[in-house]
Amino acid sequence: MLFPTEFDVIVVGGGHAGTEAALASARMGAKTLLLTHNIETLGQMSCNPSIGGIGKGHLVKEVDALGGAMAAATDESGIQFRILNSSKGPAVRATRAQADRILYKAAIRHRLENQPNLWLFQQAVDDLMVEGDRVVGAVTQIGIRFRARAVVLTAGTFLDGKIHVGLNNYTGGRAGDPAAVSLSARLKELKLPQGRLKTGTPPRIDGRSIDFSKLDEQPGDLDPIPVFSFLGRAEQHPQQLPCWVTHTNERTHDIIRGGLDRSPMYTGVIEGVGPRYCPSIEDKIHRFASKESHQIFLEPEGLTTNEFYPNGISTSLPFDVQLELVHSMRGLENAHILRPGYAIEYDYFDPRALKASLETKAINGLFFAGQINGTTGYEEAAAQGLLAGLNAGRYVQEKDAWCPRRDQAYLGVLVDDLVTRGVAEPYRMFTSRAEYRLSLREDNADMRLTEIGRELGLVDDVRWDAFSRKRDAVSRETERLKSTWVTPKTLPPEEATALLGKPIDHEYSLAELLRRPGISYDGVCGLKGGECGPVEPLADEPVLLGQIKEQVEIGIKYQGYIERQANEIERNDANENTRLPDGIDYREVRGLSFEVSQKLNEFRPETIGQASRISGVTPAAISLLMVHLKRRGLGRRNGAAAETTEQGGDTVPTQQ
């Protein structure tokens, strides 16, 4: 049956990538259909009950700055909030929250059901409708055909998923949900390059059987309580709960080693590669054999359940081994396991077959986002989903794709890494992956992206109004600190000594004083009995006031470093944005080695910047490529047509 309504964009899958994709597409005015195998699992946290962390929290803030749902849903469902690396520099500080699974899922579903231009439909997708080199719709398991001009595929771990517990295995997309076997087979028919990856999850524990008196308590931050969204307030948070800490020991490790002969990972049953930075407990005791103990965090799953998530013991060992290893740890001697841990293998598709817009190079209008691209993590999925949904909507509206740069957003780093380097293992975001991380901080994600989001149609009036007030207040206050002066005559020596350690000997602006180590914004604003404070309130809301003060302080203290990084970005811009002609044959570039020309012809980079980051492409090869392009440009000056970048980059002649 052909469904009577035609849509602009169809999103397949209702996880973290799919929900952000559907919301983004609908926000910018595209008529969007979200197809999911089960409406009850929209926004489900399939693995750990947490959002954020180092690098990951940066992505969540960027999704929020672009109008996405993840941060706001976390503020409404978070039962513990912490700032990681709070004693370190602002570039690596990151927000992390424990979330109540039920509340988080409800917050996401509420947004989906109340988003204009968005329709939901419950049916698994078995096939894509493809005409020539473009996608035109999707077909469900009972044969309903939905037509659309673009499709965003966010299938997570469901593509030909296989669940392993010991040497037992069965098909499944996650515990309790069926795998997407037919859809996986259809994608293989389309000759898209694919492989297998693996991830895992730990056994869940009944909190009533845990002896908390033997554990170390880990509370969240309370003064102040962090928020995730730039529009968030601490009052939105539900009741806050602590996490708890225990440790593995030598007996635990002996139990694990004794079960490796029945481990699907160590007997070759699992062929997929697992995540390096979220290893199973089997991997940990094998890779870090000299380590006597590993820290395990017991994380509450919610306010209305006794279930705990033991972060750090992801495993696919047989259940009897899981039971024994859990009981070997302090506080868990009598623990009751509610759900066994398991590993899951699934299909992914080589992201080097994607454009930077996340559209497939082979099939027009088909976009991929999330674990199908070889990433791991809710946050990485949500960020890709937002970008894919946005660009699917722009594709339908016949507008140029928006592709964030590496110097613009962690989202830009994520996508550029995927489409230029591919993945050999599940990809996870870290701050260390960003070369411009001082400019890509959590605190300035809105300053970097909200204006762009407004232009793209992603940011509503409420967010825009709050952002505009913050932006203007930061600018005014920064200028005030630069233009407000204190002198030895106007600043009493005892007051200067209390703040600076000694009296001042000449005139200083408040900004100059603030640049000194250990001096805070509140400190300089309190000088002269508070006379140096702002004449007018910076903001009505305490959260917004805190954001403004933070922005002003960081901007002034790190001004020199930030300007130096901006100059470096400007120097690199020419190569980064120079687009390569679609039809170029790299075998014709004089001096390129066979290996380099083969890689460039295979992966078809869109810009010189992308080409420079492909493994094996040397700086010398880039120089040869630039010479080749300049020669052709000189030879085509007289009226030759030229191809320009979609984002305003340099002009490179097209090849004829």
From Swiss-Prot:
SUPFAM superfamilies: FAD/NAD(P)-binding domain (SSF51905). The lineage of its organism: Bacteria, Pseudomonadati, Pseudomonadota, Betaproteobacteria, Burkholderiales. Residues 636-656 are annotated as: Disordered. Residues 644-656 have a biased composition (Polar residues). One of its GO terms (cellular component) is cytosol. Gene3D superfamilies: FAD/NAD(P)-binding domain, GidA associated domain, C-terminal subdomain, tRNA uridine 5-carboxymethylaminomethyl modification enzyme MnmG/GidA. One of its GO terms (molecular function) is flavin adenine dinucleotide binding. NAD-binding protein involved in the addition of a carboxymethylaminomethyl (cmnm) group at the wobble position (U34) of certain tRNAs, forming tRNA-cmnm(5)s(2)U34. It comes from Burkholderia vietnamiensis (strain G4 / LMG 22486). FAD binds at G13, G14, G15, H16, A17, G18. GO terms for biological process: tRNA methylation; tRNA wobble uridine modification. Homodimer. Heterotetramer of two MnmE and two MnmG subunits. NAD(+) binds at residues 274-288. This is tRNA uridine 5-carboxymethylaminomethyl modification enzyme MnmG. It is found in: Cytoplasm. Keywords: Cytoplasm, FAD, Flavoprotein, NAD, tRNA processing. Its cofactor is FAD. It comes from the Bacteria. It holds the Pfam family GIDA_C_1st. Belongs to the MnmG family. InterPro entries: FAD/NAD-bd_sf, GIDA_C_N, MnmG, MnmG-rel, MnmG-rel_CS, MnmG_C, MnmG_C_subdom, MnmG_C_subdom_sf.
